[in-house]
Amino acid sequence: IKKITNNGRINHYSKQNITTTWGYFDHMKRGVLLMNIGTPDEPNVESVRTYLREFLLDPDVIDIPTPLRHLLVRGIILKTRPKKIAPRYQSIWMEEGSPLRVFTQKMTDAVEQNMDDTVCEVGMRYGNPSIRYGLERLKKSGVKEVLLAPLFPHHAQATTESSLKFAYKQMKEINWNPLTKELGHFPNNPNFIDPLVESIRPYLQEDSHLLFSYHGLPISHVKRSDKSGKHCQKVENCCGISLDANSMCYAHHCSLTTEAVSKKLGLSKVDWSMSYQSRLGPAKWLKPSTTETVQNLARNGIKKLVIVSPAFLADGLETLEELDIEIREEFLSEGGE
């Protein structure tokens, strides 16, 4: 975080007191709010329902007219999905609590230990400890200069934008106006790529295949990042070309990470694949899906599969359960080893 911040993006979501370089105001007490997506408090139906209600009613997540969003979420999703998801959380729950919360806190503690005279707090966009709670703790600690750090390497409306906008709203509500800076996206920053590569390398064998599985997004979210309206889904290999039109595109950022990692590992194109997981609802989402990709790889003779999820900086339901249990079983059932 400390290294990536030095090349970070300056505040795009608020015009208040923007600092251009971290540490410029060295005489002021500094703080970092590490923001992750969030998790239920407990692995039971009611806690999952409470979490999903807050998450799915966010217009940055399901961006349809408010009446339709409430009808969909309250009238359909919340009546059925919590019962299906609660057992999945139970299968990965730790003694200390939710894996995502536990690992995000450990990351926050490690960042604080490696940054001199800096207070670090966790802020979950949905659930606890909330972004507001983290900001209030920083304020009470006497912090005058704060870095808002969304833990999402790839920019998206539903993650980075939602977290930052909500953080500024909460800062206003608690009447706190510190000097601020944002940690922007960092899909191919060496300080992200290098340790990611080293975490993958020990698992690769001569005959193994590497699958990059990213959290999926609705196509409508991806298209909205193309301010020109002339590039996304209209140009061949639109995500593989770096232009101003896709500079804030989630799918393009995922491609940048995949390219950087595969290149540093010395992999040829036949040695790796890229897919998207965790689809929700009937809307068109980014393709190919991780489930279909894994099935096809196994059917085409791939026996040893390594899956990496660069979109998640802390393990949670999508990695520990969806990939390590569900997708693993899918691969084995299709003949994989």
Features from the language model and the residues they span:
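Active-site-proximal alpha-helix that buttresses catalytic centers in soluble enzyme cores
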Residues: 28-337
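General helical secondary-structure elements
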Residues: 5, 25-26
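Polybasic, lysine-rich low-complexity intrinsically disordered segments
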Residues: 3-6, 17
